[in-house]
Each structure stands twice: as C-alpha cells, then as structure tokens.
A protein has these predicted regions:
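S-adenosyl-L-methionine-dependent nucleic acid methyltransferase catalytic domains
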Residues: 1-195
C-alpha cells in the first residue's frame, strides 16, 4: 500500500538524485525544483509532509547538502480544479552542493544548539525589509527550512541519544518548532495563520 509506494518513490528518487550528484561539478550549486500538491500540505504545518520528507531524504541520501531553499508562488489561488486532478499548492527551489566526503557526525543536542544559534539571524535576514522583505510572511515556514536543513545536511548524520541517525522528519519538526506560536507576537501569529 502506502508504505510500498513511499519506498518505491524514495528508491527511484534517490537513484535519480545520485545521477544528478555524479554529474554535478563542485564549483557550481545544483538547483532542484519541487512542487507541493495541495494534498501534501493539507494536514501538516509548514512543509512537514510525507512527500516532502521523502524527497528531502532522497536528496540527502544522494550525498547532497542543502545550502538554501527559496519558496515560489507559481500557482494561482483561484485555479479551477477538475475532478481527479492534482492541484499544486506551491513550489520550492532547493540549492544544493555535494556534502563533504569526510563530513562529521554530531549529536541531537549539538544540532539543536546550532539551530538556536543560526535560525534567529536567518529569520531576521528574511524579514528585515518590512513590507519589502525578501520573503513574504506566508512563505517563512518554507524559507526557514533552507538554513535549518543546511545545518542538518552538512553532517554525515545527526545522532539521536540511542546512536541512531535522526530522520528528516524529526529534523523538519525541530526546524519548524522554531516557528512555534510562542516565538512571535500576537500580530505576527495572526499574519502567519491568516496567510
């Protein structure tokens, strides 16, 4: 069923990303376009959805490290949806480079420490322009994934307390936790939920 479909997608996408990684030149970043279906984002906060997690897992398994993400509004809000069609909700560009072959491993605690040290400045960079900010408020939850996953993916593994590698899902949850409601004032919370 669903688990077999996810495994099939992960294997196929990992193979495709391995081919891209083999052809990538270290002097240039690789950009990958990913489009979210509405069904992927319906029941999840931000971008923590199964398809997105599986796609990111394939990119990381291929040996890429993310250096950034850029959300794109490519779909019309008022698009007519036909019966049985998949409507796209939004799109995102991933910017990647090959991960260092001698990349170290870190603990969950060190990963969280790095998130807490780096994400506030990254968020400030995305919002410091006010109305003219480089990232719209509605896209912040997707955009913050770039700096967060850049930290996560630079390592060969982030190890949980039991020594097992942290999953992409857990990493995304920790990154999205930075976006928890209590981190923002009332007006910002309203805007984030409104959009």
């Amino acid at each position: 069923g669903k688990d077999k479909a996810e495994a099939f997608f992960l294997d196929g996408m990992t193979h495709a990303m391995n081919n891209v990684a083999e052809q990538a030149h270290p002097a240039f970043p690789v950009t990958i376009y990913y489009a979210f279906k509405q069904a992927e984002t319906k029941d999840h906060v931000g971008t923590s959805s199964t398809g997105w997690e599986t796609f990111l897992e394939a990119v990381l398994r291929a040996g890429f490290a993310l250096t950034g993400t850029w959300p794109m509004r490519t779909e019309r809000d008022a698009r007519s949806i036909g019966i049985g069609t998949n409507a796209l909700a939004s799109s995102i560009i991933l910017v990647c480079r090959k991960r260092a072959v001698n990349a170290p491993t870190v603990s969950r605690r060190e990963f969280i420490r790095e998130l807490n040290a780096n994400l506030p400045e990254a968020l400030l960079d995305m919002t410091r322009g006010g109305v003219n900010s480089p990232v719209a408020p509605v896209d912040l939850s997707q955009a913050i994934i770039g700096p967060g996953m850049a930290i996560f993916s630079q390592y060969a593994a982030v190890l949980e307390a039991d020594g097992q590698p942290m999953s992409v899902r857990t990493a995304l949850q920790l990154i999205n936790r930075f976006f928890a409601e209590d981190d923002f004032d009332h007006d910002t919370q309203f805007c984030l939920h409104w959009f």
